[in-house]
Amino acid sequence: MFPAVLAAGVFLTALADSTRGRIACAVYTLTACLLFGVSALYHRGDWGPRAHAVLRRLDHANIFLIIAGTYTPLTILLLPGSHSAPLLWGVWGAAVLGIAFRVFWVGAPRWLYTPCYIAMGWAAVFYLPDFLREGGIAVLVCVVVGGLLYSAGGVVYGIKRPNPSPRWFGFHEVFHSLTLAAFAVHYVGISLVAYQHA
């Protein structure tokens, strides 16, 4: 998955026509590569206890990064400065706090940190009219559908249900499937925004 995400991110960054757009898309690409790269290492490697603990912290912390990274091109390319600055500062500030929380309390219960991911992800609800006005219905649908898929994944992760086949395709695989679908939908939306503003 990591090579595909990297290639898609490079394409997206090249699609943006302005310096601001390229920087915003590069930030999104970097956070996506960190998420998928670290997740692949964490889940596929046979690590000792110490390396496993470090990778687990990074894996969980990267969720906050991808949320803020996803907001970055949408906010910079779609919102006026009076709206974009508060949203960007808010989500990146929340990301820093969330990362510190997950790094220093890696054993926190799911019921405590999963709602933090979901709440941070839905900060955009106050800006949906702006996204519709500046991006159009297709972009708005991508933002909302991606958010719903991420939220569904968060709920599955939090309650560990459904768990159809624990050995082969359990709740964790359902969670990852939903988040992959959410990422793909958001990527399409961000690509539409970058293309519109190219």
What positions do the PLM features span?
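Multi-pass alpha-helical transmembrane bundles in non-GPCR membrane proteins
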Residues: 1-198
